[in-house]
């Protein structure tokens, strides 16, 4: 049986579109800075090309295009010699400013021997690289804020995770407005949710309560009450989340980093890391163990996200209900990083606020949690009584 014309016209079709051909303008984190300070060159596939990353004699990290402008050798397979990176093909020595400094077998270096040097930022133990399709340097007002705990002995060192994801990086950006997925995908329970977009910053403020159906309190363990999360993207790919876990009688303060850089239009490297504030309850090794436990918990959450992304389709025209977040407004904000600077429109950067009315979601989710707990209790009762019935029958 075929549908009539009127019924056919009512069907909502998905507009998948295609990912932007260019990569986002902004600061992108490449990982822990210390990993690049071992005296060796490192290759990084990013922005549709290959980069070489190394630290000079002053421990200052340098980044160039990886392919030598002489004959195309891969500089990331070369050697660090003094402050320069030496090509493995003919030993041309390239400085951090992109200029060829020395050719051992040549009388002179050609004046035009220059490759692309990338702006870097080594801050709070993290390495950032600036990407701009127009080739402009980073503006003074587009910055990554300092993370006080990252350089303090009162906090742990970074616990860091890295994985590749085979999809366009817009998928992870959408999560900042998607309150409902925290309940259904991550088994969290948001009770307050607000977004603020302004300039190059997009923020999410969330409060959550513990879920006894999915993460029941274990006897002898601290009881979690809930969590407070104040998370902001500074630019297209780097999020700082001031995350507080609330337990009976005390809180645990942490900072979660959620960041990525594009490899190609359909692949990105996802990284996330955590530090935890030490306290009388969390000293020394115990604080680091807590950071690792929290980090492993966050890792499971990202694995849940990745499984969704792996199987979903790109959708440029999502069909939303009132209790969905401001997806279209977020995507307008995100678009500013994919157009030339002179084409950034006010609607991409003007302040926008949206606080979710959580009345309906919280009521529905509470019923679901209660039903899950009741179902589990009935199953436990049935399981415990089964052996007794078997013995009586015998």
UniProtKB/Swiss-Prot annotation:
Example GO BP: lipid catabolic process
InterPro entries xref list: Cholesterol_7-desaturase, KshA-like_C, Rieske_2Fe-2S, Rieske_2Fe-2S_sf
Binding site for [2Fe-2S] cluster: 68, 70, 87, 90
Domain Rieske: 27-129
Names of required cofactors: [2Fe-2S] cluster; Fe cation
Oligomeric form and interacting partners: Homotrimer. The two-component system 3-ketosteroid-9-alpha-monooxygenase is composed of an oxygenase component KshA and a reductase component KshB.
SUPFAM superfamilies documented for this protein: Bet v1-like, ISP domain
Role played: May be involved in the degradation of cholic acid, a steroid acid found predominantly in the bile.
Swiss-Prot/TrEMBL keywords: 2Fe-2S, Iron, Iron-sulfur, Lipid degradation, Lipid metabolism, Metal-binding, Oxidoreductase, Steroid metabolism
Entry's cofactor comment: Binds 1 [2Fe-2S] cluster per subunit.
EC number: 1.14.15.30
Ligand binding (substrate): 245
The protein's name: 3-ketosteroid-9-alpha-monooxygenase, oxygenase component
Induction / repression: By cholic acid.
Gene of this entry: kshA
Lineage summary: Bacteria, Bacillati, Actinomycetota, Actinomycetes, Mycobacteriales
Reactions it catalyzes: androsta-1,4-diene-3,17-dione + 2 reduced [2Fe-2S]-[ferredoxin] + O2 + 2 H(+) = 9alpha-hydroxyandrosta-1,4-diene-3,17-dione + 2 oxidized [2Fe-2S]-[ferredoxin] + H2O
Molecular-function annotations in GO: 2 iron, 2 sulfur cluster binding; 3-ketosteroid 9-alpha-monooxygenase activity; iron ion binding
Residues annotated for Fe cation binding in this entry: 175, 181, 186, 305
Organism: Rhodococcus rhodochrous
Gene3D superfamilies from the UniProt entry: Naphthalene 1,2-dioxygenase Alpha Subunit, Chain A, domain 1 (3.90.380.10), Rieske [2Fe-2S] iron-sulphur domain (2.102.10.10)
């Amino acid at each position: 049986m075929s549908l009539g014309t009127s019924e056919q016209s009512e069907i909502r079709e998905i507009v998948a579109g295609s990912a932007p051909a260019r990569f986002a303008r902004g600061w992108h984190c490449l990982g822990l800075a210390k990993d690049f300070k071992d005296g060796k060159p490192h290759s990084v596939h990013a922005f549709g090309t290959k980069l070489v990353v190394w630290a000079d004699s002053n421990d200052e990290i340098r980044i160039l295009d990886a392919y030598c402008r002489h004959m195309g050798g891969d500089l990331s397979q070369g050697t660090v010699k003094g402050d320069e990176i030496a090509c493995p093909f003919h030993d041309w020595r390239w400085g951090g400013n992109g200029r060829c400094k020395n050719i051992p077998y040549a009388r002179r270096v050609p004046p035009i021997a220059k490759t692309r040097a990338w702006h870097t930022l080594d801050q709070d133990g993290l390495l950032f690289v600036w990407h701009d399709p127009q080739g402009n340097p980073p503006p003074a007002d587009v910055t990554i804020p300092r993370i006080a705990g990252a350089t303090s002995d009162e906090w742990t060192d970074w616990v860091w995770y890295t994985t590749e994801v085979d999809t366009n990086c817009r998928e992870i950006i959408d999560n900042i407005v998607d309150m409902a997925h925290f309940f259904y995908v991550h088994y969290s329970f948001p009770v307050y949710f607000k977004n603020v977009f302004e300039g190059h910053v997009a923020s999410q403020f969330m409060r959550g309560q513990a879920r006894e159906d999915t993460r029941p309190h274990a006897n002898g363990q601290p009881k979690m009450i809930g969590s407070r999360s104040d998370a902001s993207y500074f630019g297209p790919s780097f999020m700082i989340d001031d995350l507080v876990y609330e337990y009976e009688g005390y809180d645990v303060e942490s900072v979660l980093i959620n960041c990525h850089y594009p490899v190609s239009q359909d692949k990105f490297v996802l990284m996330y890391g955590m530090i935890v504030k030490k306290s009388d309850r969390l000293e020394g090794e115990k604080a680091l163990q807590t950071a690792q436990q929290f980090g492993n918990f966050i890792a499971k959450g990202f694995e849940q996200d990745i499984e969704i992304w792996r199987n979903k389709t790109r959708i440029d025209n999502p069909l939303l209900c009132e209790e969905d977040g401001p997806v279209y407004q977020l995507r307008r904000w995100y678009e500013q990083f994919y157009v030339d600077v002179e084409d950034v429109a006010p609607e991409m950067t003007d302040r926008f606020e949206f606080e979710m009315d959580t009345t309906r979601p919280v009521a529905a989710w509470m019923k679901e949690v209660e039903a899950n707990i009741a179902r589990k209790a009935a199953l436990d009762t049935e399981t415990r009584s089964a052996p007794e019935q078997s013995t009586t029958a015998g």
